[in-house]
């Protein structure tokens, strides 16, 4: 499979398929620092990034905002002193789409 960071998000309509259990098992191995959370019955990807201070956390948040606008796919973001919690899911399908895994991998790349 092509590296997730080399892929582009595709338009995700309300009738787009959610990832299957098999796809989930394969894709989650490609982003090992991410976990799967279920909130209100909606499966989501989540990761907490740690930073030395608020300014670094905010700089990361701003880079993530630029990436989200570029890919036209937007996460939940909670920026706090020393950490940023990022949550990816596809609102239109109320669950996980391949786009979410692509964006999780690209989010990790922002640390480089």
Curated annotation (Swiss-Prot):
Report the GO molecular function annotations. Answer: 4-alpha-hydroxytetrahydrobiopterin dehydratase activity
**InterPro entries of this UniProt entry?**
PCD_sf (IPR036428), Pterin-4-alpha-carb_dehyd (IPR050376), Pterin_deHydtase (IPR001533)
Under Enzyme Commission nomenclature, its number is 4.2.1.96
Entry's Gene Ontology BP terms? tetrahydrobiopterin biosynthetic process
Q: Which reaction does it catalyse?
A: (4aS,6R)-4a-hydroxy-L-erythro-5,6,7,8-tetrahydrobiopterin = (6R)-L-erythro-6,7-dihydrobiopterin + H2O
Where is the signal peptide, in residue numbers? none
* Key words, A-Z: Lyase
Keyword Transferase listed? The answer is no
PANTHER family to which the protein is assigned, alphabetical: PTERIN-4-ALPHA-CARBINOLAMINE DEHYDRATASE-RELATED
Task: Tell me its family.
Answer: Belongs to the pterin-4-alpha-carbinolamine dehydratase family.
What name does the UniProt record give this protein? Putative pterin-4-alpha-carbinolamine dehydratase
């Amino acid at each position: 499979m092509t590296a997730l960071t080399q892929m582009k998000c595709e338009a995700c309509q309300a009738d787009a398929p959610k990832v299957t259990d098999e796809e989930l098992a394969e894709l989650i191995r490609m982003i090992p620092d991410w976990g799967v959370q279920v909130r209100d019955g909606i499966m989501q990807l989540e990761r907490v990034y740690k930073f030395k201070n608020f300014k670094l956390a905010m700089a990361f948040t701003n880079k993530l905002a630029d990436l989200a606008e570029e890919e036209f796919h937007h996460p939940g973001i909670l920026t706090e002193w020393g950490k940023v919690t990022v949550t990816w899911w596809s609102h239109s399908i109320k669950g996980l789409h391949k786009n979410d895994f692509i964006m999780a991998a690209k989010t990790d790349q922002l640390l480089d």
